[in-house]
Amino acid sequence: MWGLNNSVVSITMVSRYAELGVDVHKKGIEVFKAISHSLFPYAFCNVGEDPDLPGYGLTLHTDGAGSKPVISYLLWRETGSVEGYKNLAQDVLAMNIDDIACVGAKPIRFVDYVALNKFKVPREQVLDALSLGFSECLTHLKNHGLNVRFAGGETADLPDQLRTLDISGTVLGRVKLSEAVTGANVKPSNVIVGLGSGGKTRYEKAENSGIMCNGITLARKCLLKRDYAVKYPEVCDPEAKGYYGRFDVDTYVDEEDLGMTVGEALTSPTRIFTPVLIRVLEKYGSCITGLVHNTGGGMTKCLKLGRNVHYVKDAVISVEPIFRLIQKESHEDWRSMFEDFNMGIGFEIMLDVECVDEVLSLVEGFGLKAQVLGRCEAADGRNRLTIRSPFGVFNYEGS
């Protein structure tokens, strides 16, 4: 559990994650802002006018599963299981669908992109597992009122470019412009409600570690044994830091109350929050000013939402076991941990105080953990974030 102390940490340092070649700040992508267009510049993702439906907007979103396919590959090589490949289907859908949900959009079409090295990866087995995963996940979404159609995709054999495989997807969504969550109205006095990334909801079949798809490079390298880089050199760039952990992929871990194997924890599929969010928006949309999917950037992701907002997260929460284990094994500083990982909070809702109790009750009705994380205050010039934890008080600024 978090507690509070009086230390304030705002020192900039190179994180363990950055040392592995991953930039959570994604420096350089700002050049694309000059050629992109959005009706709502302070929203979580871009929205453009629907040319065929007056009063509606379209959002087109692309994302992938990061380096999670490497874990799926290792799990297959060591155990013969293709479950990790199947889980990637939900990962890719979740990373896209929940992002567009942040503007209130519902998904209508989805395509995937799979690139692999067929000299290393069992092409047919991977595609069969992914097909089954997409089919099950899309059926599940349809049962919850989200009729997103699979519209095909691309499979590329790229042995000279890829060591193992990569997977991503693109979703097309539509939103009624008068009901869009624009982020422009996030204001002082708004409350921040967090939705849990781990555990098991009433609409899920298994326990989830909460890892989602971010921070995986650090997670796998600090947890898994160095032998894997020797046995399967394709799972690690020889010029980068290798694996230095204590565990096999099939090691069952009780430490930090994890209660599953390392492979299960690292391939836990990213939770899809949209079935819950559409109900929240239907009933309490007028109270909601902002929505944030805590993917790249972890608990600092809110910095891209709204303008001149100081997000203060000072509530007591439980950091999921997988993140406590990663921190212990990697020795990543806690300030960076909150940037690298969601830490157990996969989604955030900014809303008016009078709706908080009702929203919490609705969300918890799905068996999804939810709680008040903090509040919004005024900021001058740029967005800011303060996280209070037992490990220090950490301050962050938006770009």
Where are these regions (language model features)?
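Helix-biased detector of long, well-ordered alpha-helical tracts
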Residues: W2-S399
